[in-house]
Structures are given as C-alpha cells and as structure tokens.
C-alpha cells in the first residue's frame, strides 16, 4: 500500500538479506539445530527424520528414511509429535504444532538459543523414552 513504515521495513529487510553470506549463515544455523535434534533423538533410539532448506525445517517421527509428501507425513507418529511439541512448549520452545507445518529459524537465533533448544529436546527425548 506504500505505507512509509512498511516500505522502510521492507527496504531494511532486503538490505539485510543481501549481505554477504546471509543465506549461508542461516542454513548453517538451521543445520546445527536439525543435526542436534537428530543426534539427541538417536541417543534415546527415537526415530526422527529431518528436512530443511535455508531457515525452513520439518522433523518427523518415523522409521522411514525420507519424508517427501503428504502420504509420508501421514504415516509418521503424530502422537509422538504431539507429546514432543507439548513438552517442548513447557520448556519455552515453540515449534510448529503439527508435523504438517514447517518451522522457521531466523538469523537472529543465537548459538545459545540453538544449544538451549537442543538440550531441552534431549531432556524431552529422555522423558519420552522413560515413559
């Protein structure tokens, strides 16, 4: 609509994402989070598959090696996803509430944020395995 505040925000956003290595750094952060979640799940023998690109990601509780489409997601353990989601939420970590939805990481998520999330996930996986 040409609102000056919206235009200024848009220009600033474009300036930020045009900075050298912006997308490379964003993907590195996402990879760190996804690999951390995968390793934490593996530690407790929980089947977790991950998909990610740039700052967008998804993870799925399944033994299948690839999750590529709606049918694949439908065959995942939705009950385990819901339990994981709720336990992570209690720890202050908000993921997308369904494995049918994508999650997003931003360039502003710090290594401290990512490490905290991975540590919380490891505790949740341990709890899920014990129960």
Where are these regions (language model features)?
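Conserved N-terminal phosphate-binding loop of PLP-dependent enzymes in the Aspartate aminotransferase
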Residues: 1-131
